[in-house]
Amino acid sequence: MFEKTNRMNLLFDFYQELLTTKQKAYVSFYYLDDYSLGEIAEEFEVSRQAIYDNIKRTEESLEKYEEKLGMLKKYQQREKLFSELEAQLTKKNFLDEQVKDTLEQLKNID
């Protein structure tokens, strides 16, 4: 569950502008503020089932956006390369061929 929550939070960060106002609100309450479905339903005066259905549809939409746009995947690739670069620079005090290659990979991600 923790892994799914983290993924949804990241997807929400990248794609929230593509969501409706209602979708943003429900997902924000559920994933960011850790409200229960019942608490969100009470807040918006709708059924718990309506909240559940909307959140599930929104999760599917976020996954489809990621499938098509790949912003999270690219972000994770960049982060991995930055970590590798940091490790290389820590070991060496100057730019060498290995560091140049890693920098080139960073440039080619997008």
UniProtKB/Swiss-Prot annotation:
Membrane-spanning residues: none
InterPro entries per record: RNA_pol_sigma_r3/r4-like, UPF0122, UPF0122_fam_protein, WH-like_DNA-bd_sf
Domain of life (superkingdom): Bacteria
Record-linked Pfam families: UPF0122 (PF04297)
Gene3D superfamilies xref list: Winged helix-like DNA-binding domain superfamily/Winged helix DNA-binding domain (1.10.10.10)
HAMAP family: UPF0122
Family: Belongs to the UPF0122 family.
Function: Might take part in the signal recognition particle (SRP) pathway. This is inferred from the conservation of its genetic proximity to ftsY/ffh. May be a regulatory protein.
Classification via NCBIfam families: PRK00118.1-4, PRK00118.1-5, PRK00118.1-6, YlxM
Protein name, as recorded: UPF0122 protein lwe1821
Species the sequence originates in: Listeria welshimeri serovar 6b (strain ATCC 35897 / DSM 20650 / CCUG 15529 / CIP 8149 / NCTC 11857 / SLCC 5334 / V8)
